[in-house]
């Protein structure tokens, strides 16, 4: 009897190779599909409009859940409890602080022969006080604030360079405050120096140089009207001791607020505006009055206010028959207010400046922020 060997076919390498090729092709296909899907969905993930599953989010990324955290959909984020948030605020009077307005009225009534224009607005919530806020009065040097704004508008439009030289001519030489008038005709000053000296020491010749560079009185007045400064006008070269240049408390406050709320000027020019306004050396009216209301020492208003968390960027005016001061006030909680005062009265009458200080002092109670809540661990 013969024995027979099994004739069953022995498996070779064909099937495993084919299986591996199929798996590789499937992997490549799935990779292409997944990559294309992620590319299409990436913008939505980046904007937070679509959450990645926990197994796909990178550790430490915004979309990655904390260890042990629930993967259930999150409720919509609640608005910040911070009252001013990221808003720059608005020049919009919403709710009158009648007690402050009445206090101003009482102070003004004690000096019946003085004409008063006063305005204050908290940019972050719209609280305001006003007394004769739109009354046109002699602007004195307070008009230099809107002139600075008009100058920086040219910078933004590319019609002016910050280092452009301005030439001293006989037309623009002005008496009174400043040193530029003492230089020989033909002297050239860079625009940044002219603008700074106009605010820092209230140089009248510097102011006239900028009025001329903007295009003259008619052109700058047109710009004022376009900015909504309806009571503000340059009718004479500085120093304008006759008081023909006019403004109002609301206009002065508006010219500052338009910059700080981003309604006028670029971010860079806004920074220049603040930088220049911060150089003003006269601080006895608005800053001094505010410090008085806060109960501080009167030696150095700016330094004393800073210790208390306040900062005032202001510009004054003084032609004897009229005094003014207007500025941006930064408060300890980060919110901001604008305030302006213009008083017309007898020549060099100390009651005018004292009235501005008293009215500024009256603002202190409403500008003191509430204590910050204590953090709980």
Where do the model's predicted regions map?
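N-terminal post-signal-peptidase region of extra-cytosolic proteins
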Residues: 102-104, 132-136, 150, 324
């Amino acid at each position: 009897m013969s024995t027979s060997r099994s004739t069953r076919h022995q498996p070779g390498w064909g099937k495993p190779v084919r299986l591996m090729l199929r798996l590789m092709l499937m992997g490549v296909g799935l990779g292409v599909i997944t990559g294309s899907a992620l590319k299409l969905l990436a913008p939505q993930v980046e904007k937070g409009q679509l959450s990645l599953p926990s197994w796909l989010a990178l550790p430490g990324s915004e979309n990655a859940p904390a260890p042990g955290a629930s993967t259930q959909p999150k409720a919509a984020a609640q608005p910040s409890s911070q009252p001013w948030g990221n808003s720059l605020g608005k020049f919009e009077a919403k709710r009158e602080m009648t007690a402050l307005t009445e206090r101003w009225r009482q102070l003004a009534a004690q000096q019946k022969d003085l004409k008063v224009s006063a305005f204050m607005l908290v940019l972050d919530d719209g609280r305001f006080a006003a007394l004769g806020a739109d009354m046109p009065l002699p602007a004195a040097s307070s008009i230099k604030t809107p002139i600075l704004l008009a100058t920086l508008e040219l910078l933004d439009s590319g019609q002016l360079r910050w280092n452009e030289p301005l030439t001293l001519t006989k037309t623009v030489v002005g008496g009174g405050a400043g040193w530029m008038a003492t230089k020989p005709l033909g002297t050239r000053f860079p625009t940044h120096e002219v603008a700074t000296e106009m605010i820092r020491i209230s140089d009248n010749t510097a102011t006239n140089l900028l009025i001329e560079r903007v295009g003259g009185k008619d052109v700058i007045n047109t710009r004022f009207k376009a900015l909504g400064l309806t009571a503000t006008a340059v009718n004479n070269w500085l120093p304008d001791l006759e008081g023909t240049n006019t403004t109002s408390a609301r206009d002065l406050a508006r010219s500052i607020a338009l910059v700080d709320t981003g309604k006028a000027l670029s971010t860079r020019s806004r920074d220049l505006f603040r930088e220049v306004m911060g150089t003003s050396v006269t601080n006895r009216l608005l800053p001094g009055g505010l410090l008085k209301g806060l109960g501080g020492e009167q030696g150095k208003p700016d330094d004393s206010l800073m210790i208390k968390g306040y900062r005032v960027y202001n510009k004054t005016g003084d032609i004897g028959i009229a005094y003014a001061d207007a500025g941006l006030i930064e408060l300890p909680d980060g919110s901001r207010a604008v305030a302006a005062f213009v008083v017309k009265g007898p020549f060099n009458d100390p009651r005018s400046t004292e009235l501005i200080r008293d009215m500024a002092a009256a603002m202190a109670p409403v500008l003191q922020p509430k204590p910050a809540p204590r953090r709980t661990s």
